């Protein structure tokens, strides 16, 4: 039915047969009854050509396999026919992304840009930058994947967990966090009431299934993961489990899961402080210093179900990413970036003054910003003319 309507719509604006490119004001007699069969054959061929042009406009990669080009027709492709084709194409592209080079243009996977952004925009997190880049790059470059990639971000508030997630989305997807292929859930906002957990489970599963059906590469971000209900954590397990051997020969959609949590922030700070006091530089701190104490604190947290969930017990989390506490020099860089981001002038004295407004702990050493880089944009407003 759709093809029939398309055929009629495209044939309505056609001119009578005549010379190639003949103008409308040059009349040509219609064919006799004896030539009607031939003209109908040409009409069918032209309709087929319209459909091929229409489909190639939407799915150009499907046209590369055609062995022989479509032979030229006796009728030209009229202006109004071309416009009809453009209208139909634009209408369908409202519901499906159409790319000039084929593929899914919603997905960019700009790993070079990701590496650059992590180096320039994310301050004081050499471990997180290196681990995330290596994990994501390795996952995306695999010919076939055996499971979803699961990364768990841990650290104090304001250390850059959400910021890194946003950088990642900006480089993997054309529309960043607003992409159809990205879903973000905040525990206290999307799942606030335990008594409605069954409803939350149905809605979460529906959104995840729809997103994976719509995108061959999707990302799900769970902020405040330590506050997720046990029922929701259990629901996520099948999505993170390795694929069965029988299904590994079939190409599966890729999925990235990011869990953002404050769990482990205290032990990360303690380890970093002790290493700095012992004479280590910040850049000399490795994952080996933090991996064991971080996972121990996560699993022993009494006020969270995350550590006791099947996600950890079944080893479904691929990497635990530590975010180190930020020092004065990092906060100062955040202040500078905030000015630059708003295209505002600043002085070195202003950067120092705003950075010193933050609270630093522990009380004796005053090394780490207790809020990280949070609230800096609000503090900048105090210095505007």
From Swiss-Prot:
Subunit structure comment from the entry: Interacts with TOR1AIP1.
Stated induction or repression of this protein's expression: By interferon-alpha and interferon-gamma, in spleen and liver.
Protein known as: Torsin-3A
Gene behind the chain: Tor3a
Chain positions recorded as ATP binding sites: 155-162
Organism: Mus musculus
Signal sequence extent: 1-21
GO cellular component: endoplasmic reticulum lumen
Compartments it resides in: Cytoplasm; Endoplasmic reticulum lumen
Keywords on record: ATP-binding, Cytoplasm, Endoplasmic reticulum, Glycoprotein, Nucleotide-binding, Signal
């Amino acid at each position: 039915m759709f093809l029939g309507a398309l055929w009629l719509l495209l044939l309505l604006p056609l001119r009578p047969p005549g010379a190639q490119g003949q103008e409308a004001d040059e009349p040509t007699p219609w064919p006799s009854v004896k030539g009607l069969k031939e003209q109908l054959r040409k009409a069918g061929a032209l309709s087929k050509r319209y459909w091929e042009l229409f489909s190639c406009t939407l799915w150009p990669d499907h046209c590369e396999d055609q062995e022989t080009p479509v032979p030229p027709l006796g009728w030209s492709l009229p202006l109004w026919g071309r416009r009809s084709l453009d209208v139909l194409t634009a209408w369908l592209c409202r519901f499906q992304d159409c790319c000039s080079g084929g593929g899914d243009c919603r997905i960019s996977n700009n790993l070079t840009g990701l590496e650059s952004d992590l180096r320039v925009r994310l301050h004081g997190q050499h471990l997180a930058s290196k681990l995330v880049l290596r994990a994501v790059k390795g996952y995306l470059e695999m010919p076939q994947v055996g499971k979803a990639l699961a990364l768990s971000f841990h650290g104090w508030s304001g250390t850059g967990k959400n910021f890194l997630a946003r950088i990642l989305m900006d480089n993997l997807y054309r529309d960043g966090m607003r992409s159809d292929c990205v879903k973000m859930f905040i525990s206290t906002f999307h799942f606030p009431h335990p008594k409605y957990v069954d409803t939350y489970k149905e809605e979460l599963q529906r959104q995840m299934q729809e997103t994976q059906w719509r995108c061959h590469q999707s990302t799900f971000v769970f902020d405040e993961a330590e506050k997720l209900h046990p029922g929701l954590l259990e629901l996520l397990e099948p999505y993170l489990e390795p694929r069965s051997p029988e299904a590994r020969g079939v190409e599966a959609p890729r999925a990235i899961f990011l869990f953002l949590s404050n769990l482990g922030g205290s032990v990360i700070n303690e380890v970093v402080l002790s290493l700095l006091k012992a004479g280590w530089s910040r850049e000399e701190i490795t994952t080996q210093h933090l991996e064991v104490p971080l996972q121990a604190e996560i699993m022993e947290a009494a006020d969270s179900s995350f550590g006791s969930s099947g996600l950890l017990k079944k080893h479904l989390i691929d990497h635990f990413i530590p975010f180190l506490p930020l020092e004065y020099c990092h906060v100062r860089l955040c202040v500078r970036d905030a000015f630059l981001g708003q295209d505002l002038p600043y002085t070195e004295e202003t950067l120092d003054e705003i950075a010193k407004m933050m609270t630093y702990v522990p009380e004796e050493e005053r090394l780490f910003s207790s809020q990280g880089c949070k609230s800096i944009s609000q503090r900048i407003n105090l210095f505007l003319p």
